[in-house]
């Protein structure tokens, strides 16, 4: 499975927003999740059964709409030779469009990650949770909490903590038994501590090195002082993992609950890492802006003009940007106009209005997503595209003060 680009993630998120907003009457919207290992023949048989059961629905309108949606699915499945590697999801049903009217709508999604469970769902809204989960961060971090008595090793995958192994030591307490000199006892104790640290390092290295190198973003170590500092200083982890240690954090527990404590303690660090690339790009933009170097552009008009002359080095687009470039035309006098519409999920499609020249009705001839347009222009000129979250101050400022569109230029253009 190939990793989604930032633009693909944006498009996927936008599509789910659109589906989330659609509502049906009663249970007229069908969601069908088909994993790769599911036989199409079996799915078809179940849909035929559901079609038969729908005949018992008392409301004639609901019965007609549900059976119509199932018939639409059966028709689509006839042309599906093989389920894609990641599975396939169908959404279909009579969507309420207001004024006591409905519209039969369908959407097909090839998910970015494999579907693991087959599901047929009939409700007044589409079932989106499995796909929305795919939008969540899947970055992986190695977790290790330890003291001289115990250690627990785990992974943080996205927001989910997985405990893999718990180790206990044979390190004796600080009080020596009778018959041993204090010096000899201390030597044996240090050897036992070293051996335990080595055992922890070997076990943690085995677990962390099994994660794909590009997916493992770093290693977090927790525990009381001075244990975690001793372990870190002794370089007991594989040398590649040693380079990925992001920090040492105080935790009171070293069992499985200590892993949760470690993640909470490192929360700010993890968020900074997740947003670091975005933060750096936005800060570079503000640096150039404050320096008045002329190597920045912001706002739709300025940035579009610089993209068209291949002057953009880094294009910054807010993840919350929702804008369409609408073209309207008059078929009578030939008047044409292009304008940008900012929108929110659930808002109706743009209306054309009347021609300012002759008064005739205008026609919407083209609608293009501004993000799609700008991403395509950036791709043609090899400009880097950075999608920026509003979860940090500068990202929020990019959206609110600059309309969610800005650029760092290769040279000053005066445009």
UniProtKB/Swiss-Prot annotation:
Coiled-coil residue windows: none
Keyword Manganese attributed: no
Localization (cell): Cytoplasm
GO cellular component term of the entry, any: cytosol
SMART domains, per database record: eRF1_1 (SM01194)
Source domain of life: Archaea
InterPro entries: eFR1_2_sf, eRF1_1_Pelota, eRF1_1_sf, eRF1_2, eRF1_3, Peptide_chain-rel_aRF1, Peptide_chain-rel_eRF1/aRF1, Ribosomal_eL30-like_sf
A UniProt-annotated Pfam family: eRF1_3
GO molecular function: sequence-specific mRNA binding; translation release factor activity, codon specific
Keywords: Cytoplasm, Protein biosynthesis
Function: Directs the termination of nascent peptide synthesis (translation) in response to the termination codons UAA, UAG and UGA.
Family to which this protein belongs: Belongs to the eukaryotic release factor 1 family.
HAMAP family referenced in this protein's UniProt entry, alphabetically: Rel_fact_arch_1
Subunit record text: Heterodimer of two subunits, one of which binds GTP.
Protein name: Peptide chain release factor subunit 1-1
Organism: Methanosarcina acetivorans (strain ATCC 35395 / DSM 2834 / JCM 12185 / C2A)
Gene for this chain: prf11
